């Protein structure tokens, strides 16, 4: 049904809890709005609480019956991630869908997180890896209590095709290119989502790991990069006509919504828009995965490296339950 799937096909979601990182703007907010209109219970996880409050107020205007809460979560800080996850797990409530959406893009100069990681890899990859692992008990609880499989939805990018993973330089310490660091983070996101799906399959787990990408969406993240060489070149070539190559935020959210709600979305699936070489469109379908993103041994090594860097271990091939290292 992917070729004909639309947001109207989202089923009623009453009783299901969705956590969306970076839900205050862009694709995250657009997805939250569609889910709210289908009666989902939402957790909006945002770094900037002021912007989060504004987004929540706007959401309540557009979907007055929404059940939503705002939580503070800084994915560039393991302290923040651990604090939030501990509070959430203590509530003993199931989490049916985790949408790992937040991200930073093409930071001009190499910047470090509070934990000493390169900002894009630390936020986009390690932050979400740790968050997912620390929330795993809530996903397992949902699996036990619901017949509808819980899902981890990872937002990747067509940018993953433009680079290869440098396992020995994940932090871009040897040389820093703003765009390449972003591309590597998105490649890592996709490889980890695929690796998660394989581990879940081997454990016969009902939980699904699904990836999606928005095409090229006109979001705050994209606009924040508008002083890059790429953006300047595009403006010079196309001026205002560039909009024909960009999804708006609502269109950009469709692959995420498909991955998060469609009964046809599969474990290990990767979905995106189907027009203009996957750059835009209202039609959602299977997205192309670069051959180098399918390297299973490299993905397994990346998973282990993320465990070592974050101190969070889950879906371990030698363990049946989540184990967190003492940092």
Please report, for each region that a protein language model flagged, where it lies by residue.
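Short coil/turn segments at secondary-structure junctions
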Residues: 115, 119, 176-180, 240-243, ...
